[in-house]
From Swiss-Prot:
Subunit structure of this chain's protein: Homodimer.
UniProt biased composition (Basic and acidic residues): 31-49
Recorded name of the encoding gene: grpE
Entry's family note: Belongs to the GrpE family.
Name by which UniProt lists this protein: Protein GrpE
Composition bias type Low complexity, residue spans: 50-68
GO terms for MF: adenyl-nucleotide exchange factor activity; protein homodimerization activity; protein-folding chaperone binding; unfolded protein binding
Length: 247
């Protein structure tokens, strides 16, 4: 009885063991299949990740390329703009330099003209002051010459001679004042004719006397501070060898 029970227990145990073993094999196969499936899934995931990574890298590369191109284009545009601005600046500098040169030349010219104008104005003013009495002296000469003619008038009357002597002293005093003021008589009698100092009213032809010589003074001339106040009116001797031969 005990042997049969033991045998039955043993058989049951063996059966259970077989079933367990079978179950174990099935589990291992399942595990293998699961492992394979997992590996496949992992591979797929890896491939997906790789593909995504590649796509991402490609996208990044494309973006980087576009970014580089975009960055490069602004740099080129900026360089062109800078070059253009530098050219414009250089042209403006040249224009400014030329304008400054023209302005400087014009300024120097105007300054020179202003200096010359001031000099002329000062000279004119000085001459006006220097010769301020010219008109007065010119107007005084005529009565002075009339007085001289009266003094030179011959007379036998002693009383009149005394008066004439007094007039002569007065005339000499007036002449002295005029000389002190810079008035001097132009020498003309028997002097070579000078058109700057002499004015010929008459001409004669006398070969015995020097040609172009003043033979007579018709009206006295005067200088006032070395300027001609009035030219001397003269009679001039004019002759030449041709005129002598023709005669």
């Amino acid at each position: 009885m005990f042997l049969e029970k033991d045998q039955d227990n043993l058989d049951n145990l063996e059966t259970q063991a077989k079933e367990l073993h079978k179950d174990c094999k099935e589990c291992k196969n399942c595990q293998k299949e699961e492992t394979k499936t997992t590996n496949k899934d992992n591979q797929k995931e890896d491939e997906t990740v790789k593909n995504q990574s590649n796509q991402s890298n490609q996208s990044n590369q494309t973006k980087q390329t576009n970014t580089k191109q975009q960055k490069h284009q602004p740099k080129e545009n900026s360089h062109l703009q800078i070059t253009k601005l530098q050219t414009q600046i250089k042209e403006l500098q040249q224009q400014l330099t030329q304008q400054k040169k023209s302005f400087d030349e014009e300024l120097l010219k105007n300054q020179a003209e202003l200096i010359n104008f001031k000099k002329r104005a000062q000279t004119q003013k000085a001459n006006e002051l220097k010769y301020a009495s010219s008109n007065f002296i010119t107007n005084l000469l005529m009565p002075l010459e009339q007085l001289e003619k009266v003094i030179d008038m011959p007379t036998q009357n002693e009383l009149l001679q005394k008066y004439l002597l007094g007039f002569k002293l007065l005339q000499q005093q007036i002449k002295k004042v005029l000389q002190d003021e810079g008035v001097e008589e132009i020498e003309a009698l028997n002097k070579p004719f000078d058109p700057a100092l002499h004015h010929a009213l008459e001409t004669v032809c006398d070969p015995k006397k020097p040609d172009k010589t003043n033979l007579a003074v018709l009206q006295k001339g005067y200088l006032y501070k070395k300027r001609i106040l009035r030219p001397t009116l003269v009679k001039v001797n004019e002759w030449s060898d041709k005129n002598d031969k023709n005669e």
